[in-house]
Regions:
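Short beta-strand scaffold positions
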Residues: 28, 65-66, 104, 127, ...
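Amphipathic alpha-helical segments within well-ordered protein domains
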Residues: 34, 75-76, 114
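Acidic catalytic patch
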Residues: 98-120
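Short active-site oxyanion
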Residues: 60-63, 99-101, 140-142
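Acidic, metal-associated active-site segment
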Residues: 126-143
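Helix-adjacent hinge/juxtasegments
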Residues: 75-104
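Short, well-structured N-terminal submotif of metal-dependent ribonuclease cores
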Residues: 1-66, 79-89
Length: 151
């Protein structure tokens, strides 16, 4: 069992991330990825702690799901707000890792996300957020790693 990790947000243990029922896949949101690949981000240590717990087998996740919209937003944000080096490291990790699973968003899923985006005006969510949620539903993925509150 991994040791607790001290972060600016407090002490983090594997139990902070443990789902209510065991699933082996989880979607990974762009803000989580941005924090993970940007050592200057205030939530970097929290994202790293999660990955440590996954790597050490303390959490059940074996597939970290990303899609075209997640990758685009995370890479662009890393390039513009951190550095091209951080963005390139992120993209190389996706190519080399067996943990990350790339799943393309189908046209039907994207069309549904666009319709919901236009209809639900009371949420402060981006089109990417709606696309990720619709894609998760289509893949039957119950959990997402994100720092957004509107999921």
């Amino acid at each position: 069992m991994a040791e607790p990790v001290d972060t600016p947000a407090g002490t983090i243990t594997a139990d902070h991330f443990r789902p209510g029922h065991v699933r082996h896949q989880v979607a990974v949101g762009p803000k989580f990825l941005y924090a993970l690949f940007n050592p200057q981000d205030q939530l970097h240590a929290v994202s790293r702690a999660f990955m440590t717990f996954v790597r050490d087998g303390d959490l059940p996740y074996r597939r970290l799901i990303v899609d075209d919209h997640i990758v685009d937003e995370a890479a662009t944000r890393l390039k513009k707000q951190a550095s091209m080096r951080n963005a390139a490291s992120f993209l190389a990790t996706l190519d080399e890792s067996t943990l990350y699973q790339f799943e393309s968003v189908s046209e039907d899923v994207f069309d549904g996300a666009k319709a919901t985006f236009v209809e639900w005006t009371d949420l402060d969510a981006s089109l990417t957020d709606f696309t990720v949620a619709a894609h998760m539903e289509s893949l039957e993925v119950d959990h997402i790693l994100t720092y957004d509150r509107h999921y």
